Amino acid sequence: MQVLVRDNNVDQALRALKKKMQREGIFREMKLRRNYEKPSEKRAREKAEAIRRARKLLRKRLEREGY
């Protein structure tokens, strides 16, 4: 991953790098890989995340339609 440093502005380049890493999901991946996760725990977590996403989508849909 590359970030251009313009006019020796390292702070701005660092912010751009963090934003790129956030968009790519690198921080989340690092957090998940920090400890070993058993396959059964991984399936349970992914299932819970899918349910959460579905509920959120349904809530947004209902809010938009005005129910």
From Swiss-Prot:
- InterPro entries from the xrefs? Ribosomal_bS21 (IPR001911), Ribosomal_bS21_CS (IPR018278), Ribosomal_bS21_sf (IPR038380)
Pfam families on file = Ribosomal_S21
Q: Which PROSITE patterns match?
A: RIBOSOMAL_S21
Q: Which GO terms describe its molecular function?
A: structural constituent of ribosome
Assigned keywords, A-Z = Ribonucleoprotein, Ribosomal protein
Q: Name one GO biological process term.
A: translation
Which GO terms of the cellular component aspect does the record hold?
ribonucleoprotein complex; ribosome
UniProt lists the family membership as follows: Belongs to the bacterial ribosomal protein bS21 family.
**HAMAP family in alphabetical order:** Ribosomal_bS21
What protein name does the entry list? Answer: Small ribosomal subunit protein bS21
Q: In which organism is this protein found?
A: Rhodospirillum centenum (strain ATCC 51521 / SW)
Taxonomy of the source species: Bacteria, Pseudomonadati, Pseudomonadota, Alphaproteobacteria, Rhodospirillales
Identify the gene encoding this protein. rpsU
